[in-house]
Each structure stands twice: as structure tokens, then as C-alpha cells.
Amino acid sequence: MTCQLKVRSKIVTALGSGLLFLVAGCGSDEKSTDKHAACDFGAQTGCSDGQVCEKVEGGAEETGCFAPVTVEGRVVRADDPNQGIEGARVVGRDENGAVVSLRIAVSGADGAYSLRVPTPRKEDGTPAVPALLLRADASGFATFPSGLRVAIPVDVSQPEKSEAGYRVVNDTTTVALDELADASGLGSVSGKVLAEGAAGTLVVAGGASGVADKDGTYVIFNVPAGELEVRGYAAGLSLEPASALVKAGSEVDGVDLAVSDAALGAVNGSVSFVNASAKTTSVVLVVASTFNEALKRGEVPRGLRAFPVSGAYAFADVPAGDYVVLAAFENDELVRDPDESIGGTAIQRVSVSGSAMDVAGFKITGALAVVAPGKDAPELLDGVPRFEWADDSSEDGYEVTVLDTFGTEVWKNVDVPRVSGASSVTLDYAGPELSSGYYQFRAVSWREEKKGAASRTYISATEDLKGVFIVP
């Protein structure tokens, strides 16, 4: 999903939406000072102080010692980007949830963090910084990404060379978090995933989640008080669940997740395309307890994303648990067919417990293109929002809904009239005054089964991740 960010005043580009994954490099005449020294990439040993072991592309040696590459930035309040957030856990991941950074970083008093990113080098030392997206969690703040906030790729195209190595630091490395309206009844859970390959494991308790570090340690912030089950999710990893008695304002530590001998399962299904020019989409498995019914999104564990999908799809090595299956969720000019009167249009749910599970096929249709705001990325607005989207060809009208960043409905108009002779439809917002924050408009086209009938058949809709705008 391609995104171009629009930034003004205090709005931070790290708040944007959309997914584009790039691998870029920056030219350098740097030579590895220990070019022929033996070093162990996995153990990170064999290099002198100030250097790290990296893989070498196309060289005589498979590894070499080089100055490190770091991604640096700040975690700040969304309502006051000058104020940093201390104690936030920041991790770099790829599009499938695998950890790209060497370790999770914890922000300092001013919100500053630094992530060491293992980076392949050319033989002359030129770094090819891998694509990565940032996730940040902090006590009392909504996780980024979550709600309407979708991770954007860090701009790794121009790493800055310094005496200590290479630094990636720009607007995309600043992460702004939304403060929760009420955190009084929340606590936290911490522990360790006791398994090899634990890095990136999604750990969930009470609908809240955290990500395990390379050594398996994890912290889940903002967990509702009560006795809760704690579970870990990652493709290919089976873990025993644990329990935690969470008290508001305190942390339950030592909640470790051991490897289980329970069999992994599988999820199989298919998609079909109706009235769609695009014929390739993606399918993801969302942990059910994290699913937001209003926004139709949630947390996807490492490795449980299938792309590209043009017909049948299959997830292997799926850990036990309850999942929501989403298709055509990403920006691909497609949406799940909104006509609930026919088969293959409902969101699928599946419980996995060691066997193969088949889910009903999805019908996918072409999306209504968003013109403004939020065509490519969250858009900062001045004044009353005016919504514009592509006209459908056979509609009798539209329904438009405005949601806030947590999925709460702010305003709805269910009788937007059809247009004739125009390529797009416009509608001025006429709801209550919007406070500062993120919002999304969604449009759905409909037609009447019979003229004057009360029942409606829904035809198409705007995409799940588009139409997002920012009120300053």
C-alpha cells in the first residue's frame, strides 16, 4: 500500500497511514576495518569495539565488521509533540510482523529511543537498510499502530553517516501516541516467552497486546483489571497459556509462556472477485480478542498474513486460538463485498485447535475510490470536512459514517442521494464539532430491491484504511 504523507505544524508524519515496503541504500566509501576478520552474525561476536558483525552481499566473505546502523527518534504525545513519553517500548518489524531491529528499545525521559538494525552490506561497506515499520507501546497510551492509526514505513533511503556509524533519523522515526481517556482500571503484565525464535511473538491479555523481544521478554500495557488468560501467538510456535491476576495501577510480572506440545493447526479458504479490476489481495488472521468490531481490524500475529492471494489461500502452523479472518483489508482497490444477502460476504471467524480448518470463501469487489480527504494517507484538514468519493454506477444512494480513532461513531447520514452525470459524490460534514484527533469517513453504496422498498442491497464501499483525516 503506497502512502504519501501530508504534514503541517505539529502533526508528526509517524502518525500516517498506508503500507509501502522499500529496501534502500546510501552510497559510502566505508571499508570494513576488520574486513577479513572472522565474526559470528548470530552471536554478534568477533568484531572490535564500536563495530558490529553484518552479512555481506556478493563479497568473498559472508560476514564482516562494520560501523552499526541505528534508527533513532522520539515517542511523543499526539496532543503535544514537544512532550516525550518515557518508558515506551519501540520495535521495528517487517510487513509480516517479524522483528527487524536487533532488540526492543525503551524510550528515555525525553521520549528518545535508538534501535540497532542489522543491515546487509555491500563489499565496500555500503548499507542496504531493510524496510521496517515501528510499533510503540506505553502505559496510559493507545498502542501505535492501532485504531485508525496504521504504521507507515520508516524512510530509510538516506541514512546519515557519523563517526559512530549510520543513523536513520527523520520525521518518520517520530512516533506519536494517543493518551487513553481513562486508564484508572488498567494494569500491566510482563514475563518471558520461553522458546527459541520468540522475537516478535504477539502476547495478548484481556484484548491488550505486547511484542516479545529477542530474549523472549515482553510487557503488555493497559490490561484491564481481573483474572485473565495470557496467550502467545506466532506462526510455527505453540505455547502454553498462562493466567494473571491484574490489579489496576500495578504490574504482574513473571508470567512466562512455556513451549507446548500441542499440535499446530491450519486455516484454508479462498477468495473470488466480482466486478473488480484488481485480482490480487491479501488475507490475514486477527487474534479475536483484539478485534475492533467498529473499525474491523485488530492484531495480526507474526507470519499470519497471506499475500498475494488470487484464489485459494492456506495458513500452516497456526497456533491454537480464536481468529477473525480478514480479506482485502489492505489498500488494493478492493473490499469485501458488503452485500450481506448473499454468501461469502460476512467476516469469517475460526477456532484453531491443532487440525485444519476450512472457512467459507470471500467474495471481493472493487472499492469506491476515496478522492478526499485521506486518498493516500491521513490528511490534515482546515474547516468543516467535505467528503468526496467515486460515484458508483448502479446505486440509488449512499450511507456515510464518520468514526473516531477508537471506532466510536461520531456521525452518520444514511440517505445521501445518488448523483447523475458526475464522476464523484461530495458530502459536507453536518455532525457535532470534532475535537482534535484522527477520524475516518466511510461510504457505502446501496440500491433498493424495489423502488420505495425499505430493504437495501449494499453494492460497494470505500477501502478499510482510506478516508482518514486529522482535525488539528
Locations of regions flagged by a protein language model:
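N-terminal secretory signal peptides that target proteins for export/translocation
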Residues: 1-8
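Sec-dependent signal peptide recognition
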Residues: 9-17
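C-terminal motif of bacterial Sec signal peptides marking the signal peptidase cleavage site
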Residues: 22-25
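Long luminal/extracellular ectodomains of secretory-pathway precursor proteins
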Residues: 27-460, 465, 470-472
